[in-house]
């Protein structure tokens, strides 16, 4: 467990029992009970293998704002992080707000355990207005059959961290570092990670903007603004091509601007047609792609549809 001024984080550790060295976690009983009058700011999960190119749940649904408790999204719960506005029933009215903010989330998810979601209890244990939520495992059918909703872990083994952040204003919610504070590095980095600023044509021009001339214009824009990078989005493999990407990388380097490249994550788990495809789902192809990017000076990647 970890406790600080505005954060609480906890996880479960399962020890080996007699000769049993593996456990399958069928269900988690962690629950959060919020007081009556609490309102919610939540992102509902969609059913698996629906939506655009069967990519859901893709965590791109709209948040419901200042909504009442007791709902369960579109019957599939909510994606983390989950924000709640809690009323202080005994706080003084007037100058100071009588509300507080609570953020429930998770961190430390890796390949040994599944990510979770937040579900609303059908029958709140405290009565009231349905302010009881609990950790749910993934939906059956997600990822088109890749993986299992009940993780098997070698013992001793641990769950991801469950986190709660509380603040009288939204500042502690926005500024919390709890997702990083409790997670240990998996390996030593070759270089220090540095934050940077960049530009991105797709957010305005979408797929047609992913062409050589427009990306060169965005490199010039980033350089003029003092930004460090440009994100070249989907379809660069067909609308720009590898030789021209290398040329853009050289041009960007001359301007002090590095490139990030978009990749489709998919192997068998969705039908998203945008390329490059089938280069990030298998180790051999991924390593070859990373070597090529390193050789031409690409700074990093954006992986989509996962």
Report the location of each language-model feature.
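Generic structural signal for short, flexible, solvent-exposed coil/loop and linker residues
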Residues: 21-23, 73, 150-152, 188, ...
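An acidic-aromatic substrate-binding cleft motif
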Residues: 150, 154-229
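Sequence-level detector for tyrosine residue identity
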Residues: 12, 59, 63, 74, ...
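N-terminal accessory beta-strand-rich subdomains and adjacent acidic, glycine-rich linkers
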Residues: 1-175, 179
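Residue-level detector of functional hotspots within protein domains
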Residues: 18, 70, 147-149, 185, ...
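Substrate-binding cleft of carbohydrate-active enzyme catalytic domains
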Residues: 195-306
